[in-house]
Amino acid sequence: MSRFLICSFALVLLYPAGIDMYLVGLPRIAADLNASEAQLHIAFSVYLAGMAAAMLFAGKVADRSGRKPVAIPGAALFIIASVFCSLAETSTLFLAGRFLQGLGAGCCYVVAFAILRDTLDDRRRAKVLSLLNGITCIIPVLAPVLGHLIMLKFPWQSLFWAMAMMGIAVLMLSLFILKETRPASPAASDKPRENSESLLNRFFLSRVVITTLSVSVILTFVNTSPVLLMEIMGFERGEYATIMALTAGVSMTVSFSTPFALGIFKPRTLMITSQVLFLAAGITLAVSPSHAVSLFGITLICAGFSVGFGVAMSQALGPFSLRAGVASSTLGIAQVCGSSLWIWLAAVVGIGAWNMLIGILIACSIVSLLLIMFVAPGRPVAAHEEIHHHA
């Protein structure tokens, strides 16, 4: 079992590493490519676009051909794209490399969640996804630090060579450690069960909405945090970095505590707790009389996301034993596109950073609480499938 957990964690971590590691080198990248930092900031959106594009096909391919046939090319593409970025001499080529990086990371991301659905029952999967969420929270803190240490001795291109090395490690794991987990092709008698695993299932759609809104909350916070903390609240850059590190610490602590909480409380209780924390955070930020109270509200955001997101993802994947790849893709596309659409629309309409965050917190909590209370699983689902090793 440990081989599946190690491989899944490695596959997922390519995604945040590809986002956070290069940011520290952005000024030098812009200077070398004769582009402005503002022009290269689009590299984040291009990377997410690549991930979303991969998710359009990766899940279906993973369900038809297996998890390894998607993970291996995905890791290989991430390696090639990382090298391509390091060799880019224009901003156009650099952005093209970032899109290809996103494609590779997206393939690996989808496969990771499908593997966890294949190999774990509902309760263990919720615990593992909570742990995975905690580990993912470490990357935004450690990746820039690692990038800074690399750039003390080497040029910015070395950042992408480091990403390529990470991709090689994931590729080796996928080739030699990961065993195929896709359930064997269903017999004729299993076709009704396969057809019943509809993406239009009310319970699945409710969890898609909940997880998409939750991701929108956390990405809105990350996207607006420089404005909130440095421009509105007046913190210096060093203080901003310290606060963000502390929020990551809160996220990690809660994420690592959630598996223990699942041994005491029902998953539904933790999901309700998550949304109550979001609502409390929104109200706190709306009426905050001081910076200290506002910072407390921010910690509630991090705690709320960490206590509920892994549980909601586990519930969303639960009904899908034969279509776990497609379900994972659907969740990923909804989360990436939904959160990006909200942030873009709020910017176009001219909603300020503070109100943008308060608005999504309150909307997420109200909608999600209603869905949690009124949309229950339609039927019991198989805890997990027996793992079939394919040659």
From Swiss-Prot:
All ranges on the Periplasmic side of the membrane: 25-41, 90-92, 152-157, 223-244, 290-292, 352-355
InterPro entries: MFS (IPR011701), MFS_dom (IPR020846), MFS_Efflux_Transporters (IPR050189), MFS_trans_sf (IPR036259), Multidrug-R_MdtL (IPR023697)
Cytoplasmic side: 1-3, 63-68, 114-130, 179-202, 266-268, 314-330, 377-391
Transmembrane stretches, start-end: 4-24, 42-62, 69-89, 93-113, 131-151, 158-178, 203-222, 245-265, 269-289, 293-313, 331-351, 356-376
Disulfide bridge map: none
KW Transmembrane helix (keyword) present: yes
Name used for this protein in its record: Multidrug resistance protein MdtL
Organism, scientific name: Shigella sonnei (strain Ss046)
